[in-house]
Design a protein with these regions (language model features):
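Membrane-interface aromatic/basic loop that binds lipid-linked glycans or pyrophosphate carriers
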Residues: 278-332
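Donor-binding/catalytic cores of nucleotide-activated saccharide
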Residues: 81, 102-209, 224-233
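Glycine-rich, basic loop-to-helix element that forms the pyrophosphate-binding segment
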Residues: 76-92
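N-proximal low-complexity "stem/linker" segments adjacent to membrane-targeting elements
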Residues: 1-37
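Catalytic core of nucleotide-sugar-dependent glycosyltransferases
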Residues: 216-222, 228-256, 271, 275, ...
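Short aromatic/hydrophobic "clamp" motif used to bind/position activated sugar donors
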Residues: 97
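Short beta-strand/loop segment that forms part of the nucleotide-sugar
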Residues: 43-52, 72-77, 101-102
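A conserved acidic beta->alpha catalytic loop
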Residues: 35, 50-60
Length: 332
């Protein structure tokens, strides 16, 4: 790991550390960095983790670091986004952490609003809404009046976030988090969907959440993203992430959420099964069927007896003869 440090501690008061994992994003990186550097809140350091980029992203990071003394650049061999985030937290100087993806754009007042909401409410995390699209909307940079609401992150409230798909509840952005919370829940390395795996834990250990009710984070949607690409074994990490959520709620003895996540786990596995059949991916199909059998056995206690949809679909895959009999007898 090579670290280029251009930070002058006498010039800046470091209140927030903004961590940006960077990998092959030369097309959008400048726009992202400019939006961060144009924040109305200035007491931050910017940590750029170049995760072994093969394009000019690393050079762009160094170029900005030469001009802006609050930027630290880390060049490392490719280790993945989770390791990049964890390494950024490790070297950060502030008590608050913010993660920004390197192809995204943030509103000029985002950091000011989040920090003020978190500190005024004594919350461990503050969050805003995000806008997901291929292009930035015309009114994205409009002015807002500062306001926030506070929510406790007890298990019942996490359930509400999950049901409403609120704040993209499992993701570490768009938010600021106390460094102590981020350190207590490091991102699992070597996996994708790592934010899905630990997002609910970050919320829980924050104790309370300050919510700024505006869309102040632009999440750049990739038109050739995961949903439009052929399946591979790595994408099955989503199932692993859901299992991590189940394990977390098991530790809290919160059966209701275990049931909800198990339902999503089985549904997602059935979705992957259908994708494998459609793409004639027999090798991956074997893995999916094996996973499905294990999930049904391991988490059977969380599957409602009345859920005939899951029963019908899993019987059709794993027990086709029983499926045909039940269908004739109209048991489903």
């Amino acid at each position: 790991m090579c670290i280029a440090v251009n930070y002058d501690s006498n010039q800046y008061k470091v209140v927030v550390s903004i961590i940006v994992p960077v990998y092959n994003v030369e097309k959008y990186l400048r726009e992202c960095l400019d939006s961060i550097l144009n924040q109305t809140f200035k007491d931050f350091e910017l940590i750029l983790i170049d995760d072994g980029s093969k394009d000019k992203s690393g050079e762009i990071c160094d170029e900005y670091a030469k001009v802006h003394s609050n930027i630290t650049v880390v060049h490392q061999n490719n280790q993945g986004q989770a390791a990049a985030r964890n390494n950024g937290v490790e070297i950060s100087k502030a008590d608050w952490i913010m993660f920004v993806d390197s192809d995204d754009v943030i509103h000029p007042d985002l950091l000011q609003f989040l920090y003020k909401a978190a500190t005024e409410s004594n919350s461990g995390m503050a969050v805003t809404e995000r806008f997901k699209s291929e292009t930035i909307p015309d009114d994205f940079f409009r002015q807002y009046t500062f306001e926030y609401a506070v929510k406790k992150t007890i298990p019942e409230k996490l359930e509400e976030f999950y049901d409403n798909k609120q704040f993209y509840y499992w993701a570490p952005f768009p938010s600021i988090i106390k460094k102590s919370v981020a350190q207590s829940v490091p991102f699992p390395e070597g996996k994708i969907y790592e934010d899905n795996a630990v997002g609910c834990q970050l919320l829980y250990y924050a104790n309370s959440l300050a919510v700024v009710p505006y869309c102040m984070y632009f999440y750049r949607e990739n038109p050739s993203g995961t949903m439009n690409q052929p399946l591979n074994e790595k994408k099955l990490d989503y199932l692993w992430a859901l299992e991590e959520q189940i394990k977390f709620y098991e530790e809290l003895h919160y059966v209701k959420m275990c049931k909800k996540i198990t339902n999503e786990l089985i549904g997602s596995t059935l979705y992957y099964y259908a994708r494998c059949k459609k793409e004639n991916n027999d090798k991956l199909l074997e893995i999916v069927i094996k996973d499905l059998k294990r999930f049904l056995k391991q988490y059977r206690r969380y599957i409602e007896d009345k859920d005939k949809v899951i029963e019908r679909k899993t019987d059709r895959i794993l027990n086709p003869r029983i499926y045909r009999i039940k269908k004739v007898l109209k048991i489903y």
